[in-house]
Amino acid sequence: MSSSFGKIFRVSTFGESHGGAVGVILDGCPPKLKIDINLIQNELDRRRPGQSDITTPRNEEDKIEILSGIKEGLTLGTPIAMLVRNKDQRPADYNNMEQVFRPSHADGTYHLKYGIQASSGGGRASARETIGRVAAGAVAKQLLKTFCNTEILSWVKRIHDIDSDINKEKISLKKIDSNIVRCPDEKVSTEMIERIKELKRQGDSCGGVIECLVRNVPSGLGMPVFDKLEADLAKALMSLPATKGFEIGSGFSGTYLKGSEHNDSFIKSDDSSKLRTTSNNSGGIQGGISNGENIEMKIAFKPTATIGKEQKTVNAEGKEVLMKAKGRHDPCVLPRAVPMVDAMVALVLADHLLLNHAQCDLINN
């Protein structure tokens, strides 16, 4: 089972939903980087369960413990080990699901592959695995901010069939976090919250779309062919639980345009290190390499698989059974997935920033 990601800026996550702890080993972070531990904790608080009445009622503090790699606010260049202890597990909620495969959940496929699985809390398939990613991503965000002034902003664009149209020029973290659903449109966010509450009362769930904008992206990140920047971003984001789709730039809507309509024309720039364009249908990446424009992406999340309605399924013996899930689950994963998206984008960009310096700086400088 692969639990590691990245080439130079490399993360390895560990732990399970109902185990003793979850965490991450971050290797390859440059030394002497100033790290604000509070910013790491802030990101974990944004993904923490029990933060509102539209998320899972599981109540975890998710307090970060730094075990190694950071001393007096500076990175040492050695592996950074970070840990969060699980304190509010209820494995008894899963007794009736021990050998029953939840529809559209990882239970069945894990059993087919390994012949054994940690059914309690979903094990490694649980979103608690992403705690390590978010902690490491918070370090990556500080690296990107320090060296490039890069800003990563993600927000909930759509919940179920309730969509928003956000002005990307005016988007800010303050606006995103101004409500519990993390949609920076006050009117639409109210509708989204009511829809989630309604589905929660019905024992059901919903999915939606998260949009991500990256500002102040260095040009030259990414490589041709197999290590294209958008390919690595897609892999990173599609590795998150419940993801089912990825778009960059114009995405699928670009297929309705002609080449003359879709092409991003280059224009003169005062900064010779960047290529400015009149439009951004490419989403800031061309030929697999960043051009310096904003990176714009959308990520689709399916409805939460574990719901409170009775469903038909089979057990490990292949017998048909009826099941109604217990446990504490998000009726919609998107509000808490926003910092997860931020984290994975930050990890990819930090890794490619270091790769670009390793390959090109000796010659270009």
From Swiss-Prot:
Cofactor note: Reduced FMN (FMNH(2)).
Database matches in InterPro entries: Chorismate_synth, Chorismate_synth_AroC_sf, Chorismate_synthase_CS
EC identifiers of the protein: 4.2.3.5
Binding positions for FMN per the UniProt entry: R124, A125, S126, G287, K302, P303, T304, A305, T306, R328
Residues the entry annotates as binding NADP(+): R47
Cellular component GO terms held in the UniProt record: cytosol
Keyword NADP: yes
Source superkingdom: Bacteria
Cofactor(s) needed for function: FMNH2
Catalytic activity: 5-O-(1-carboxyvinyl)-3-phosphoshikimate = chorismate + phosphate
Region (Disordered): 266-290
Annotated pathway: Metabolic intermediate biosynthesis; chorismate biosynthesis; chorismate from D-erythrose 4-phosphate and phosphoenolpyruvate: step 7/7
GO BP terms in the entry: amino acid biosynthetic process; aromatic amino acid family biosynthetic process; chorismate biosynthetic process
Top EC class for this record: lyase
The entry's keywords: Amino-acid biosynthesis, Aromatic amino acid biosynthesis, FAD, Flavoprotein, FMN, Lyase, NADP
PROSITE patterns: CHORISMATE_SYNTHASE_1, CHORISMATE_SYNTHASE_2
A single GO molecular function term of this UniProt record: FMN binding
Function description: This reaction introduces a second double bond into the aromatic ring system.
PANTHER family named among the record's database cross-references: CHORISMATE SYNTHASE
Assembly description: Homotetramer.
Family: Belongs to the chorismate synthase family.
Protein name per Swiss-Prot or TrEMBL: Chorismate synthase
Organism: Prochlorococcus marinus (strain MIT 9301)
